[in-house]
Amino acid sequence: MLRFIPSSAKARALRRSAVTAYRLNRLTCLSSLQQNRTFATQPTDDFLTGGAADYVDEMYDAWKKDPNSVHASWQAYFKNVQERGVSPSKAFQAPPLLDYADSYTALDSSLINGNNYADIDVGIYMKVQLLVRAYQSRGHHLAKLDPLGINVNHNRPSELTLEHYGFTESDLNRTIHLGPGILPNFREAGRKTMTLREIVETCEKIYCGSFAVEFTHISSRKRSNWILSHLETPTPFRYSHDQKIMIFDRLSWADSFERFLFTKFPNDKRFGLEGCEAMVPGMKALIDRSVDEGISNIVIGMAHRGRLNLLHNIVRKPAQAIFSEFRGTQDPDDEGSGDVKYHLGMNYQRPTPSGKRVSLSLVANPSHLEAEDPVVLGKVRAIQHYTSDEASHEQSMGILIHGDAAFAAQGVVYETFGLHALPGYSTGGTVHIVINNQIGFTTDPRFARSTPYCTDIAKSMEAPIFHVNGDDVEAVTFICQLAADWRKAFKTDVVVDIVCYRRHGHNETDQPSFTQPRMYKAIAKHPPTFKIYTQQLLQEKTVSKAEVDAQEKRVWDILESSFESSKNYKSDHREWLSNPWVGFASPKDLMTKILPSYPTGVNIDTLKQIGKALYTLPEGFDAHRNLKRILNNRNKSISSGEGIDMPTAEALAFGTLLEEGHHVRVSGQDVERGTFSQRHAVLHDQSSENVYIPLNHLSPNQASFVIRNSSLSEYGVLGFEYGYSLSSPNALVVWEAQFGDFANNAQCIIDQFIAAGETKWLQRTGIVLSLPHGYDGQGPEHSSARMERYLQLCNEDPREFPSEEKLQRQHQDCNIQAIYVTKPSQYFHALRRNIHRQFRKPLVIFFSKSLLRHPAARSTIDEFDEKHGFKLILEEEEHGKSILPPEKIEKLIICSGQVWVALSKAREENKIDNIAITRVEQLHPFGWKQMAANISQYPNLKEIIWCQEEPLNAGAWTYMEPRIYTILKHLGRDLPVRYAGRPPSASVAAGNKQQHLAEQEQFLNDALL
């Protein structure tokens, strides 16, 4: 069947000549009845090259559906080419009787319909189409976007000139039929023709006014046409009197709030919104439209710029609370250390004009720009999970508010964009709003990015980009509503770029004229947005001067009243919380009460039942033969109760939690199989490639198990999982690094959110970081999770032995937990312990790659039952067997993790019987009481050695040394504490296998001999 090949972004990148030749060849293939003929590109074929080829496609598709839907000239053109074999390069040329009469026939007179020849001049029609297309693709270059008028592009693209198409002034009055490619929506509205002058004026109004759009990078014709249908209309938007009054009211609040703060606190940093106040009515319009379209939950992320304004006017934080924070009158209390006012989060059930309510959540954020982006999306995804909205994305959405410099420069922006369409991560589209004040602190855009627009990164995801002048409040409102409509229609990202300015410096104490004198001279003369809009409404007679004055006075009086009440305002830190956990221990309870611990063991019959479900394949499932062996061995270990390994223990932990009703989510690179082929949580049929997830087939009433291979991102994905963990305490959320070495790509999330989020923002999380760690001779990038860095983040004081009360509160008071276990049962209990509490804490697991299958790392099923739980340390088990009893031990080696296996093996091979080895399974919070009791059982010790695989400047030595000395002081014992491990090293590990082995032999000798 004859057809044109639809154009795409990829096709445009091909050489134009090749594309043209291909299209011409396709055009002249008359099904199977006529021999294919390829035409070389000729000078007269210019209308078939470049962007024009897109229109040939559009015209042809329209003609095939309904010949009368296109202009008579197109009808003649396609009929001549397809039915009469006329060359595409000749079919449109004058005169109507074409060359080579023996081959070509005249244009079908029945298609002319009484029009004169000018009416069917396809060349003219094509040129007008190209002109319209040029406005669609390049009109934004001429749009009046800069409120200050200092960054105006005076270089008009040649494609937007009449001369480019051979038109002259005399052609402006030429009548052009509207239709496909030339303002078709106007034709549908009843306008059949326009003069060329009217077409140009209409395109200028649509594409070069106070808003503009970039959409030609979108490969989907359906989506592109959606944009055209909303913009290429006689009136893209027109607000009623009442709607304008609402916009006016919302803008007045945004304007007055900033002016009030500037009046009362002129020397305080507030990172005001002056210059972009239009964002507030725009955001409110976006929220209202989204709610009308079915949204009931919105999670918002933004940096400092305008945050206080948004907190008050959109998320409805009481003004007196904000003023109280400026005053600094709040007393320190026991609910965390707090953060600056423009970092705090907030939750609010907001009513909308339609009568519906929406749950708004503004997440807390650090000053690390854009770091909150993936956090927001993770939280949205979690809400969608708990509301059964993961497939439709109709109820919950995210809004991210960016700064122009950060949006263009921060890599996490791209990582976050990259999640938008991934299974397990998609949230159905995010609305991105850029507060584009055309400066980054003191840096001009030309030094801050390498692209024309700060939003160009969004093109890689085919998101439409709407630019809008921040001084045109109604245009901002319209574009924000249009963004909501796009998200509703296509469930993909959309970008709103509000081009504005920053009236003051980066903060209000800064002097911006040092570096941007021209800009700030213009700003000094420029009226505020509220004044501009007020003047517009006065001219329209929408409002009177008296009404304007009354509105300003009303808002100011309310703010003044709030200011007075702020003097005695007592903060309720619950207003900070961006994730209230109803029915769960509050941050206050956590700080003041000793909460009970719950058992983590499970009935053996239950374990065996789960094990059978885990390792029994469905009938007819063709698993890989090696995998069958692995699954059979794991099943036998559970049924026999002997030799349970680490992966099996993990599966049992997940399975028992699922059966108890706790959602489990595991995410990271290659987690479905496991980096080390250890997990096999997702099984692949070798014949059909269908997948089977045993953990989702335990019982009808189990909770949901989700495991997803992530994109090759650490920062973005860990931020996403952290956000996911905030939504509910009733879930075990695990992020696993491919190797622990790569987790430092996400250091910002670890430092600013996971380790400090609860202390700063009362933002609680039980996220689990699973980090492969261990020196196995694989070199400096596959050996270390940088244990020392996590331990440095821990908030415990090593200088004093804790009181009994502090020991009971250890896990409540800690900021993170860090473990390095050596037994599968320990792994099992640690995972379950993280859920079986009335509070949540981050858990960092350093897991040994070599212990995943090591015979020494095995547990019996009895160690998983109700009588057992997690042990902070594991004492020596060989007393009276291969080594002497405790009273005869002279040397105690304390270690953590897989080095225990090497030490035990070397001790056995060298027949050493006077050295005991104690394993620290939990590094933080430290097992003070347990370690003191362990040391006390050795009365004749001569020395204590801390042994580790890591170099001296890495690992746990600097963490452990002061704690061991504090314990010895507490016990009243004076013993030397010695280090045995690798020497200091700039590189994490040796890349040479022989050097690795030599270093290991050396520190084992140091420890044992």
Swiss-Prot record:
GO BP term, example: tricarboxylic acid cycle
GO cellular component, one term: mitochondrial nucleoid
UniProt xrefs under InterPro entries: 2-oxogl_dehyd_N (IPR032106), 2oxoglutarate_DH_E1 (IPR011603), DH_E1 (IPR001017), KGD_C_sf (IPR042179), ODO-1/KGD_C (IPR031717), THDP-binding (IPR029061), Transketolase-like_Pyr-bd (IPR005475)
Places the protein is found: Mitochondrion matrix
Domain of life: Eukaryota
Transit peptide, from-to: 1-39
Activation/inhibition comment: Catabolite repressed.
Record-listed Mg(2+) binding positions: 404, 437, 439
Known cofactor(s): thiamine diphosphate; Mg(2+)
Reaction catalyzed: N(6)-[(R)-lipoyl]-L-lysyl-[protein] + 2-oxoglutarate + H(+) = N(6)-[(R)-S(8)-succinyldihydrolipoyl]-L-lysyl-[protein] + CO2
Gene Ontology MF: a single term: metal ion binding
Keywords associated with the record: Magnesium, Metal-binding, Mitochondrion, Oxidoreductase, Thiamine pyrophosphate, Transit peptide, Tricarboxylic acid cycle
Record-annotated disulphide pairs: none
Record-annotated membrane-spanning stretches: none
Main location as per UniProt: mitochondrion
Amino-acid positions noted as binding thiamine diphosphate in the UniProt annotation, renumbered to this chain: 305, 404, 437, 439, 669
Enzyme class: oxidoreductase
Enzyme Commission identifier(s): 1.2.4.2
Record's function text: The 2-oxoglutarate dehydrogenase complex catalyzes the overall conversion of 2-oxoglutarate to succinyl-CoA and CO(2). It contains multiple copies of three enzymatic components: 2-oxoglutarate dehydrogenase (E1), dihydrolipoamide succinyltransferase (E2) and lipoamide dehydrogenase (E3).
Similarity comment: Belongs to the alpha-ketoglutarate dehydrogenase family.
Protein name as catalogued: 2-oxoglutarate dehydrogenase, mitochondrial
Organism in which the protein naturally occurs: Schizosaccharomyces pombe (strain 972 / ATCC 24843)
